[in-house]
Amino acid sequence: MKKRLFALSLVLLSFTARQASPQNMKTEECRIKLPGITFTRSLNHAADHAKVAGGRVTLASEARRDNFRDPDGKLSNNTAPLLLTEVDNKQPFTLTAKVTPTFLKTYDAGTLYIYVKEDLWLKMAMEMDERQKTRMVSVRTIGTSDDNNHDVIEAKSVHMKISSDTKTVGFYYSLDKKSWQLIRLFKNDYPASIWVGISTQCPLGEGTSAVFEDISLTKQSISDFRLGI
């Protein structure tokens, strides 16, 4: 009986260890501490490309780095650097950040993420589109990725917000951090343990970067999912 209990304990410990990092991905432990958040996992060597100064982090992307799983498989790319921290998805949470991307090539972007594994994630981005307009973009990936272009943003920076009350996830942006515009609402049917964080992408260019500041992760949700407040 003791041997069976010991074996069961080993199985449970192994399962717990596997759940301690984003699934099916090679991540590295890190500790990048900012006033409102501490990133503890680095995906695709993100920590090696992050510089912290004055309460902000600049995250660089090397050439041809992106996260997108095209339905036809031709453009799939899972190489963008992500800085992540774990969230208890059984509890409300809100992630906000001011994002200032450097736009050099089409699809360059600074992004916020909800991340579970390589083929299960959500992202919201300030991105340069095919007409060289900068706009809000959202992507939901469940096996393959959808792709949604939203409002054009003429400012150099934008405030982004992801909020969940455990049942619903909302994506929002603001130019003044006061008036928030809804982008998308999703059902929160993600696992009990998820990861949230930031990323920079450069699918077509030779590299770029984005500055993330005023980052905050709280254990509260917004109260109005239409107004984002």
Predicted regions and their residues:
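Bacterial Sec-dependent N-terminal signal peptides
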Residues: 1-25
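Extracellular glycan-recognition regions
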Residues: 23-229
